[in-house]
């Protein structure tokens, strides 16, 4: 068995020289959580009988989807050459939506284990996280995982990794998180190669928050990394960005179950409990200091998480509105990036406009609402935030098509992203075609090896939030991977397309789209509604319009009764009289008639295909 530390170093009395803080960065599905499981087992912090797969992923959704959403920090003892060391492993999310959380986790470390699947090679998020690690000046240990797979090509990818970060292919460690091969060698290498944390134990306390989780019984549990000074229980602490003060009720380390300690010293990673009930009180990236002896300046790199994608969430059953409100409030306790405000739609009733970090964040939030609170929800098509400047120089921020101003508009700005796409080189043509059709501008292209290409595009966020990723996967047989980050904005020719039913606007179907795509959207939506709305006694025109200009039209034909059925033969004038009378009646009906759009039509027209399948079940 492994050389576990016989006497684990005690928190608060640990010399920073024997501490090693590291995180594991990898693309989704490259075996990060499995490797973490093996480390927990080999260092002896989790007993063999308590071991379960993905030990650190606590949420059901995390386990089911096999993704990590919240960061976790674990303290593990390890012994090398007769000396005991304390290793702090910080598990990070791998998905692009949670990049800010990853960057804060990286800032809490001195080193990173760059994990790459030996059967799949380097992917877009591996690169994105690697660049983040390099920006934070971390020491990087390259590791190939899953070498037990029959499809593994360790030699090929070791050369690719060495080429990417500089170094020798021989230095790339080969491990298997599943069987445990090479994990001890990796732990030894972490102790040997990673630098110890540096800080001043006598300076005022400064600790960086890299995650905060809401616990039903204890309130908010804040995970911190101490940079300078010491933190002790029962002290009063202050958050430097909000200036809020709290009493430290409990302080300790996770290994991996929470273990209270007498304090935390320089370089140590642990948790704080202050009894606060709202996660927004302890923001990721903020600095914690001692109220009695506060630090003069906070640690750099703090930023507010900014929502990128907005969507309306409406309960199918209007009476569930209060339940949805409470559910969103509770989720906000655990997710500082979630923002919402109430909104009403003439068509869908009362609901909320919710802001998310990205599509995965939207999907997970919606799934948690449906699963944990038994809600049935309709979500409208995702939108981004546009900045509309009117001719009188007034600026309006629009996240919902119904807020789009009708007056004279001088310009509309839309958010842009830098997208990095990695794919085998045979798909370059179809990827370029897709990006150009989405108004992307090419920024560069590099060959990582003879058969893998990195494409860089500057592309509007609105074009990638809906179905871009699905199309990219289908065009590349699932081989491409995508990573993006917000990158400025541009002036664009955007218009609001309204859908009119018998001359009346239906707010739920309006969309903000590029002028070139407006016609296609109008034709698609009018066609869809023609199929979905039941026929009436009179003809119903469905029109798509930009302002007052109609760009597309479909008609739902009237149902008519055969008024001539009772005439057997007889004079033509008699028949004409009956037909004229029917025509008059239809005309009158059309003047006063209202078209009721059934709920099913709304759901079918608004949902993407994936949620449609859900609705069928």
Curated annotation (Swiss-Prot):
It comes from the Bacteria. It catalyses: GTP + H2O = GDP + phosphate + H(+). SMART domains: EFG_C. Coiled coil: none annotated. Signal peptide: none annotated. The keyword GTP-binding applies. It is found in: Cell membrane. It is a peripheral membrane protein. Disulfide bonds: none annotated. GO terms for cellular component: plasma membrane. Keywords: Cell membrane, GTP-binding, Hydrolase, Membrane, Nucleotide-binding, Protein biosynthesis. One of its GO terms (molecular function) is GTPase activity. Its EC number is 3.6.5.n1. PANTHER family: TRANSLATION FACTOR GUF1 HOMOLOG, CHLOROPLASTIC, TRANSLATION FACTOR GUF1-RELATED. NCBIfam families: lepA, small_GTP. Belongs to the TRAFAC class translation factor GTPase superfamily. Classic translation factor GTPase family. LepA subfamily. This is Elongation factor 4. It comes from Paenarthrobacter aurescens (strain TC1). The gene is lepA.
């Amino acid at each position: 068995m492994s050389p576990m530390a016989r006497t684990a170093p005690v928190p608060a009395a640990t010399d920073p020289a024997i501490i090693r803080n590291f995180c594991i960065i990898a693309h989704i599905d490259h075996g990060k959580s499995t490797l973490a499981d093996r480390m927990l087992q080999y260092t002896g912090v989790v007993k063999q009988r308590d071991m379960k797969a993905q030990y650190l992923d606590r949420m059901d959704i995390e386990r089911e989807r096999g993704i990590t959403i919240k960061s976790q920090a674990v303290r593990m003892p390890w012994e090398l050459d007769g000396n005991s060391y304390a290793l702090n492993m910080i598990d990070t999310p791998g998905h692009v939506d949670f990049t800010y959380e990853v960057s804060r986790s990286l800032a809490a470390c001195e080193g990173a284990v760059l994990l790459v699947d030996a059967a799949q090679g380097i992917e877009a998020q591996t690169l994105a996280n690697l660049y983040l690690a390099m920006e934070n000046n971390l020491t990087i240990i390259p590791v190939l995982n899953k070498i037990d797979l029959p499809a593994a090509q360790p030699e090929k990818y070791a050369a690719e990794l060495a080429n990417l970060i500089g170094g020798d292919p021989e230095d790339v460690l080969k491990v298997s998180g599943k069987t445990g091969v090479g994990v001890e060698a990796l732990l030894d290498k972490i102790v040997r190669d990673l630098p110890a944390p540096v800080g001043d134990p006598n300076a005022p306390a400064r600790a960086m928050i890299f995650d905060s989780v809401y616990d039903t019984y204890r309130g908010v549990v804040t995970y911190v990394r101490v940079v300078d000074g010491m933190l002790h229980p029962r002290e009063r602490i202050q958050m430097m960005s909000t200036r809020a003060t709290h009493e430290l009720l409990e302080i300790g380390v996770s290994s991996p179950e929470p273990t209270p300690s007498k304090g935390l010293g320089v370089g140590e990673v642990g948790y704080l409990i202050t009894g606060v009930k709202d996660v927004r009180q302890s923001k990721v990236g903020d600095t914690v200091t001692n109220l009695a002896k506060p630090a003069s300046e906070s640690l750099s790199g703090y930023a507010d998480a900014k929502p990128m994608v907005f969507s309306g969430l409406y309960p199918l059953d209007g009476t569930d509105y209060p339940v949805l409100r409470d559910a969103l409030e509770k989720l906000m306790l655990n997710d500082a990036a979630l923002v919402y405000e109430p909104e009403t739609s003439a068509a869908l009733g009362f609901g909320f406009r919710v802001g998310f970090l990205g599509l995965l964040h939207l999907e997970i939030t919606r799934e948690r609402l449906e699963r944990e609170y038994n809600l049935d929800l309709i979500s409208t098509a995702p939108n981004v935030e546009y900045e509309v400047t009117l001719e009188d120089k007034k600026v309006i921020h629009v996240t919902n098509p119904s807020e789009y101003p009708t007056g004279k508009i001088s310009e509309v700005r839309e958010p842009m992203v830098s997208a990095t796409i990695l794919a085998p080189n045979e798909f370059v043509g179809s990827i370029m075609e897709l990006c150009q059709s989405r108004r992307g501008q090419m920024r560069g292209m590099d060959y990582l090896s003879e058969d893998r290409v990195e494409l860089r595009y500057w592309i509007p966020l609105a074009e990638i939030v809906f179905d871009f990723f699905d199309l990219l996967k289908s065009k590349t047989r699932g081989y491409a991977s995508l990573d993006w980050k917000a990158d400025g904005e541009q002036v664009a020719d955007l218009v609001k397309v309204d859908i009119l039913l018998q001359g009346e606007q239906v707010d739920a179907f309006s969309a903000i789209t590029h002028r070139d795509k407006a016609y296609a959207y109008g034709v698609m939506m009018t066609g869809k509604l023609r199929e979905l709305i039941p026929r009436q006694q009179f003809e119903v025109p469905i029109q798509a319009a930009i302002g007052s200009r109609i760009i597309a039209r479909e008609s739902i034909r009237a149902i008519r009764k055969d008024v001539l059925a009772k005439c057997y033969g007889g004079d033509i004038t008699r028949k004409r009289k009956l037909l004229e009378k029917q025509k008059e009646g239809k005309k009158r009906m059309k003047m006063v008639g209202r078209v009721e759009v059934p709920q099913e039509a709304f759901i079918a027209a608004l949902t993407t295909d994936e949620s449609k399948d859900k609705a069928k079940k």
